[in-house]
Regions:
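Contiguous beta-strand/loop segments that form the cofactor/metal-binding neighborhood of enzyme cores
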Residues: 159-273, 281-284, 291-292, 296-300
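Hydrophobic beta-strand scaffold residues
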Residues: 30, 52, 93, 117-118
Length: 301
């Protein structure tokens, strides 16, 4: 199988792409990094023993794939421009979100014209607890009835949220906004129906311009309410929890004593953690292992 010759554009989040690509030498040949020539870029090039390209003109014509991890125009960066120029050069592109729909449309048009692949990178559906949540939701969708969806998320990861919902809900066809509630500076709230299911979307719509990747209150928290209980992805990195719906038969309340044998359902736990309890949850582990592995899985797809 031919190895794909790959370059990475950007040396901030791009470092995760570098590690992901280096971990799969049988599929990818890491050629170089496109950057401004900063000290960080030079250190990355030295660590991975690759070339530094300071302009797209310097990038070889035989590159198969460029991973663009540079802020897009939506966040005041030139990532969109870089992606367009690479596509015009005949190179397939995977680009990190968030990106404005109009910018994505421009890139898709060029990719189609050139018969290339343009893909928005999305590592989140490949995270272990996200996959576990999706698997559990699919099972419950077949065994029970999804009644309501509650989501809390940061605006920077709204694109991955939609993908997670697409994979976990019976359908997301048809969006019917019903009410928008101003929640102050921290969260904005929107209610509606997605795929015919009532949904509440609470968005942490704050971005610190000097450091857009930080200061988010959370990434994702998602709860699916069913007839028999609710399933929650407590955080993007877990845990996944199932809470059975509390039901105490009226006969129990009328017994006149609590010293009785309750119905079997009363002996259920109030919640069940469905994640690996021993999973390492440090931010260091997420940064150096979890995210690069998820990026690699996204590249495989």
């Amino acid at each position: 199988m031919k190895k794909l010759k790959v370059i990475v554009c950007g040396s901030t989040f791009g470092q995760l792409y570098l590690k992901a690509l280096r971990s799969s030498p049988e599929k990818f040949q890491l050629i170089g990094i496109l950057g401004t020539g900063s000290d960080r870029t030079l250190r990355c090039a030295e660590e991975y023993n690759i070339k530094v390209y300071k302009s797209i003109d310097e990038v070889p014509d035989d590159i198969d794939l460029a991973c663009v991890a540079v802020r897009t125009a939506a966040f005041g960066g030139n990532g969109t421009e870089i992606a367009l120029q690479l596509l015009e050069k005949g190179i397939n592109v995977i680009q990190e979100h968030p990106s404005h729909p109009k910018d994505m449309e421009m890139c898709y048009r060029v990719a189609r014209k050139k018969r290339l692949v343009y893909h928005i990178g999305n590592l989140y559906p490949h995270l272990g607890d996200v996959q576990r949540f999706i698997k559990c939701a699919k099972y419950l969708n077949n065994e029970d009835r999804l009644l309501y969806v509650d989501t809390v998320f940061s605006s920077q990861v709204s694109y991955p949220l939609i993908k997670i919902l697409q994979l976990a809900m019976p359908s997301i066809q048809g969006w019917e906004p019903q009410k928008h509630v101003e929640g102050g500076k921290v969260f904005q709230v929107m209610n509606g129906r997605l795929g015919g299911i009532p949904i509440c979307m609470q968005m942490n719509n704050e971005v610190v311009p000097r450091d857009a990747n930080n200061y988010m209150h959370l990434l994702h928290k998602i709860t699916f309410f069913y007839t028999g209980g609710h399933l929650t992805l407590e955080d993007t990195f877990g845990p996944v929890i199932w809470h059975p719906r509390m039901f105490i038969p009226i006969q129990t309340a009328l017994a006149g004593t609590l010293n009785i044998r309750f119905p079997d359902n009363v002996y259920q736990n109030t919640g069940y953690i469905l994640s690996n309890r021993n999973q390492n949850k440090t931010f260091e582990h997420i940064l150096t292992a979890v995210w690069p592995e998820a990026i690699l899985q996204d590249l495989y797809h």
